[in-house]
Amino acid sequence: MAGHSQFSNIKHRKGAQDAKRSQKFTKLIREITVAAKQGLTDPELNPRLRSAIFSARKENLPKDKIETAIKNAAGNVAGESYEEIQYEGCGPSGAALIVHALTNNRNRTASEIRYIFSRKGGNLGETGCVSYLFDHVGLIVYKAEGINFEDLFNYGIELEVLNVEENNKEELYVITCGVKDFGRVRDAFYTKFGEPELARLSWQPKDLIEVSDKELIDKLSILVEELEDNDDVQYVEGNFIFADKL
């Protein structure tokens, strides 16, 4: 029976992994569809779509699914209409969280997000309740490999960005710029350095809260994970960092 039990556990994990992969694909397709509907269907002329396709390819989303999503958006094929909504709240330890969602039913999504917050030791607040703790900026991220930081930094100065910094731990270069300058800066960096790992408008914390208590780290991690596991949630941003010693 031990062998049977082990096989069952493997099957269960495989099933969970497949479900996560399917959910990830659904979110990627949703982002591609929304990006294509909001702008041109040529990725070279629609940076948001180009970025969505780049992310989809990194996750090995089949090419035919990418093409179908774009064609459906271009042809206005009857289907669900999605809107972008931002939710704000606090988690354990007082950490501020901003939840970004694409939904076809705002009442359902708000109810589900509120339930996750309350069940995991947090509180969903009103719009603006925590966003004042962040700066709204354009965010562009490159992998450090193959790119000279000095070249990137000097180009950032030329484009008058807000900041260019190295994240040595993650081996990334992080560029921030004003929201109004985002399109210009993103396209300029793309032309000179190629497709970034990430390019989007982002809420960057003015100050970071360091969470060092093991129990709070676990609770906050679970809250963020459950939020990101929600079908309508694209990603979550926060103003906290976990202590390195843990």
From Swiss-Prot:
Q: Which Pfam families match?
A: TACO1_YebC_N (PF20772), Transcrip_reg (PF01709)
Q: Where in the cell is it found?
A: Cytoplasm
A GO CC annotation given for this chain: cytoplasm
From which domain of life does this come?
Answer: Bacteria
Q: Which InterPro entries does the UniProt entry name for this protein? A: Integrase-like_N (IPR017856), TACO1_YebC-like_2nd/3rd_dom (IPR048300), TACO1_YebC_N (IPR049083), Transcrip_reg_TACO1-like (IPR002876), Transcrip_reg_TACO1-like_dom3 (IPR026564), YebC-like (IPR029072)
Main localization category: cytoplasm
Please cite one Gene Ontology biological process associated with this protein: regulation of DNA-templated transcription
Keyword Cytoplasm annotated: yes
Which PANTHER family does the record associate with it?
Answer: PTHR12532:SF11, TRANSLATIONAL ACTIVATOR OF CYTOCHROME C OXIDASE 1
What is the designated name of this protein? Probable transcriptional regulatory protein WP1214
